C-alpha cells in the first residue's frame, strides 16, 4: 500500500520545476496586466473604490495588505514588489521564499477587488501556496545552475497538487450534468455569444456537429479526472493520456473564449504531472542531466524510486499541506452539496477557507444560458435624448428592444467586472461602476457621460437565451443621478443628500438611511424658495409637514400618518 501511494502521488522534481517557471510567468503576466489597470480598478478614485472591498468583507473577515492603505503610491508599490518576487520565482532564486511572498501578495490583491475574482485566480493562488512546500528550486534554477537531475518526490503537498486538479475537474463535471451539456448544445450556446467567444470560437459555430462532439468530450474528460490522474494501474502511462488531454482541453478553451488566466494557469499546473519518462525524450531531455529510471516509466508499476520531499521541517510542512488539502476538499464537498440540494452549509467553513484563499467555486460554464448577457447603460442627456453609451453616442431608436450586439470592452477585466455585477453577490459594485462612466467609458470608442452632458443613468441587463431575454425583459441593475450629491453605503444612498435639477438648482435636501428617506427633508421651487418641509420615517412622510408657494407664502400645514 505504501508503494502504491508513493507511485500515485509522487511527482518528478523536474516537472515541479516546470510548474514553478510556468506559474511565475503567469503571475508576472497577470501582475503586469493588473498594473495596466491600476488607475481603473485599484486607485482611490477607480471604478472599484477602497470602500467596496471594506463593505464586501464587513461580515466575512479577511486579510489583505492592499486594504491597509488606499494611497495610490502604496498600491503601486505592492504591485512592483509582487513583480519582483515573481521574477525571483521564475529564475529559482530562493524559490520557496519567493513563492511564499508571491502567495501573500497575490492572495492580498484578490481581497482588494472582490468583483474581479475568477477561478483562474483561485487556482494560481493555490499553486503558489503548495509551491512553498515543494522542492521547486532543485532543478532549472539559479541554485541548481539550471541543471535538472532526475528524481521523484512525494508528500502531502504533491498529493494536494494532484487532488486540486482532480477536484476541479470532477466537481465541474458533476455540476454540468444538466440538459445543455448532456444534449451536447452547451458549447454552441456559449460560443454563439459574441461577448464571451473569441473569433475562432465564433467560427466554430458554423460546425454544430463538431461542437456537439467537443461538448461531450469536455464533459467526459472532467468526469474521469480521478482515473486519468490517479490511476494506480500503469500510473505514468495513463497519466500521460490525462496530461495531454487536459492540456488540449485548456488550449481549446483559451483560443475560443475569454477566460483571462484560467486556461494558462491550468496548463502550468498540469506541467507538474509530467511523468519521469517524458524527460528521456526531446525537447525535455535537453534540459536534464540524467535519464529517468523509474520502474513505472517503461515496464511495470510495482516499484518506485520516489523519496520524501526534502525540507528542514518535514512534519510542519506536511501538516500545513495536509491542512490545506483538508480545507479545499471540504469546501469542494460543501459547494457540491449546496449546488445539488440548495441547502447552504455553515458560513464558518468558507470563512476559514478564505483566509488561505481555498474558498474555490468550480461552476464555470455549468449553466450556459446564464452567461449570455446584454447590458444597456442608458443615459438621459440635458436635451432629452436617451443614449446607450456602451454602444453608441446616438439616441436609442427602440428603448424597449433587446440589443442584438454585445459590447466591445477595452479589456477582458472590464468585461469580467460587468458580468460579475449581475450577481447579487456584488450588488454594491454597481453604483461605483455607473459613477465611473462620468469620465471614463470602458467600451471601445464610446463617449463618457460628461461628453454627452448626461444627467441620469440606468444600467440594465437582459439574461438568458434570446427567447428568455425577449420574454422576461431587462432587470435594472442600478440607477445613478449625476446631478445629486451624497454618499452610499452597501449600494444604497446613505447620509446627507442634495438633489438638483438639470440646471443645477437644488430640488431637495435631507438624509437617507440605507436607501430610505429619514428625518427632516426640504423641497424647493425652481426659484430657490422652499416648497415643502417635514419629516420621513422608513421612507414615508411622517408627522407635521408645511408647504409654501413659489412666493414663499405658506399654503398648507398638517400631519402625515
What are these regions (language model features)?
Residues 1-483:
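Alpha-helical membrane-anchoring segments
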Residues 471-561:
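Glycine/tyrosine- and acidic-biased, solvent-exposed loop/turn segments at the edges of beta-strands
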Amino acid at each position: 500500500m505504501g508503494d502504491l501511494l508513493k507511485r500515485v502521488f509522487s511527482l518528478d522534481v523536474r516537472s515541479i520545476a516546470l510548474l514553478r517557471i510556468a506559474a511565475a510567468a503567469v503571475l508576472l503576466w497577470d501582475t503586469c496586466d493588473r498594473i495596466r489597470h491600476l488607475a481603473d480598478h485599484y486607485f482611490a478614485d477607480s471604478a472599484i473604490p477602497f470602500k467596496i472591498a471594506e463593505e464586501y468583507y464587513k461580515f466575512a473577515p479577511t486579510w489583505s495588505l492592499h486594504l491597509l492603505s488606499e494611497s495610490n503610491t502604496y498600491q503601486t508599490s505592492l504591485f512592483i514588489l509582487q513583480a519582483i518576487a515573481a521574477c525571483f520565482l521564475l529564475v529559482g532564486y530562493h524559490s520557496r521564499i519567493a513563492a511564499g511572498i508571491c502567495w501573500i501578495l497575490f492572495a492580498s490583491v484578490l481581497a482588494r477587488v472582490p468583483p474581479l475574482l475568477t477561478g483562474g485566480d483561485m487556482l494560481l493562488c493555490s499553486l503558489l501556496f503548495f509551491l512553498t512546500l515543494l522542492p521547486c528550486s532543485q532543478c532549472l534554477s539559479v541554485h541548481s545552475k539550471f541543471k535538472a537531475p532526475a528524481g521523484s518526490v512525494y508528500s502531502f503537498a504533491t498529493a494536494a497538487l494532484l487532488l486540486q486538479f482532480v477536484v476541479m475537474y470532477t466537481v465541474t463535471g458533476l455540476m454540468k450534468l444538466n440538459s445543455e451539456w448532456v444534449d451536447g448544445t452547451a458549447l454552441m450556446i456559449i460560443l454563439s455569444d459574441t461577448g464571451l467567444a473569441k473569433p475562432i470560437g465564433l467560427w466554430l459555430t458554423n460546425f454544430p456537429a463538431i461542437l456537439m462532439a467537443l461538448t461531450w468530450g469536455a464533459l467526459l474528460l472532467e468526469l474521469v479526472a480521478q482515473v486519468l490522474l490517479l490511476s494506480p494501474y500503469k500510473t505514468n502511462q495513463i497519466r500521460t493520456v490525462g496530461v495531454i488531454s487536459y492540456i488540449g482541453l485548456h488550449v481549446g478553451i483559451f483560443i475560443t473564449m475569454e477566460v483571462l488566466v484560467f486556461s494558462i494557469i491550468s496548463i502550468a499546473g498540469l506541467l507538474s504531472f509530467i511523468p519521469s519518462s517524458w524527460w528521456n525524450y526531446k525537447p525535455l531531455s535537453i534540459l536534464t542531466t540524467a535519464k529517468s529510471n523509474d520502474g513505472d516509466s517503461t515496464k511495470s508499476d510495482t516499484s518506485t524510486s520516489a523519496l520524501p520531499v526534502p525540507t528542514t521541517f518535514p512534519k510542519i510542512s506536511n501538516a500545513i499541506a495536509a491542512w490545506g488539502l483538508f480545507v479545499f476538499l471540504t469546501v469542494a464537498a460543501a459547494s457540491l452539496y449546496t449546488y445539488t440540494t440548495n441547502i447552504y452549509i455553515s458560513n464558518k467553513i468558507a470563512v476559514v477557507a478564505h483566509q488561505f484563499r481555498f474558498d474555490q467555486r468550480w461552476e464555470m460554464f455549468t449553466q450556459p444560458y446564464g452567461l449570455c448577457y446584454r447590458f444597456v447603460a442608458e443615459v438621459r442627456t440635458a436635451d432629452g435624448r436617451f443614449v446607450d453609451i456602451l454602444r453608441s453616442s446616438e439616441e436609442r431608436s427602440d428603448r424597449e428592444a433587446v440589443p442584438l450586439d454585445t459590447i466591445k470592452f477595452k479589456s477582458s477585466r472590464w468585461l469580467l467586472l460587468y458580468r460579475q455585477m449581475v450577481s447579487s453577490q456584488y450588488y454594491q459594485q454597481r453604483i461605483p461602476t455607473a459613477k465611473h462612466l462620468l469620465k471614463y467609458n470602458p467600451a471601445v470608442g464610446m463617449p463618457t457621460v460628461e461628453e454627452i452632458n448626461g444627467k441620469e443613468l440606468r444600467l440594465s441587463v437582459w439574461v438568458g437565451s434570446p427567447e428568455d431575454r425577449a420574454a422576461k425583459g431587462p432587470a435594472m441593475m442600478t440607477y445613478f443621478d449625476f446631478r445629486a450629491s451624497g454618499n452610499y453605503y452597501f449600494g444604497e444612498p446613505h447620509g446627507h443628500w442634495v438633489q438638483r435639477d438639470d440646471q443645477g438648482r437644488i430640488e431637495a435636501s435631507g438624509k437617507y438611511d440605507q436607501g430610505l428617506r429619514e428625518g427632516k427633508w426640504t423641497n424647493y421651487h425652481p426659484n430657490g424658495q422652499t416648497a415643502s418641509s417635514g419629516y420621513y420615517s422608513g421612507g414615508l412622510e411622517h408627522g407635521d409637514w408645511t408647504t409654501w408657494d413659489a412666493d414663499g407664502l405658506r399654503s398648507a400645514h398638517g400631519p402625515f400618518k
